[in-house]
Amino acid sequence: TATGLDFQWTRPDHSGYYDAVANAFNSDETMPDVVLLSSDYYALYASNGFLWNMTDAWNSSETKKSGRLISTADNVLSALMVNGEDGTKAMYGFSPYRGNACCTYIKKAWLDAAGINTADVEGKTLDFNTYYGYLKQMAANKGHYVISAPGFISNEAPYTNYLPEFYQQASYTFYKNSSGQYVDGFAEDKMKEALQRIQTAVNDGIIDKESVNNSTSNARDKFYSTDAGSESGVFTYWAGTWANTLKTQLATKGLDNELIAIKPIKELGTYVERIAPCWCITTAAKNPEGIFKYFIDTMLDGGDVQTLWEYGAKGTHWDTKAETVTLAKDDEGKKTKTYEEGQFHFLPQ
């Protein structure tokens, strides 16, 4: 393999991932050597003494000395400095990428059906009233909700990322203000106003009231739904490769897959990037230095291992050999594409 390592990989079901992690941490016998944690769980397990302090290992690492890191790497890594069991800030995890952010996708077919000019939406910075007016037009045309979100609150920072136009500048939890003081964002007027906007949208039939129980997969299924009574038309979800995934899934179901990723509305200003999930070495590991050197420090080696982490395994997820690949079905049936020798291409999964 590219890593040269022999290890056991445990991959719990996505929806029950942190329940599985919590169960594994109940005993030294079941605690893994390495675990992938989101920001909240990362801070929690670090403060409880379950994670190995990799600060010194990072400072002397080949990756840090390589000169390969981009200018934003410091921002990613500084966010990983959290309090340990002794209250001292240290680096207990490593993330080889930025956290990404959610953006809002609107189905063009829904705009068209509601008589909304695409040119008035695409590439425009809308204010909330204009945006909400478009949502009401689409709801009136379809006769039901427009948005079905994966919960009213996300389970990781920044928490408000699945309904950004409604939360706007509100903060769900404590944050450091411009004076350097920590304040309770949930108790502020901005949050009260945000909750009122959400309540109004539910009462107006804009937001699916079942959003409170939705998982991410439930919300995606409603966006892909071929049932006109349950299909949603506006979905705030991850940017980047997820845009292609959403389009592919819509096409597979025979739905129009043209999506418009709108700019952040005026009151929001910018989509908020989450703190990247990070790879952590637990205190149960018998050789944390070795794990760091051969598992963590090779993730951004600029070669085969980095390629593995970014694109998957050659011959399984991608290849460069000359071949004709049959793509997944869409509304027009199967399609094939031919690649020349040396041409990078993904393989259907």
Q: Could you tell me what each predicted segment is?
A:
Residues 1-349:
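Extracytoplasmic/secretory soluble proteins
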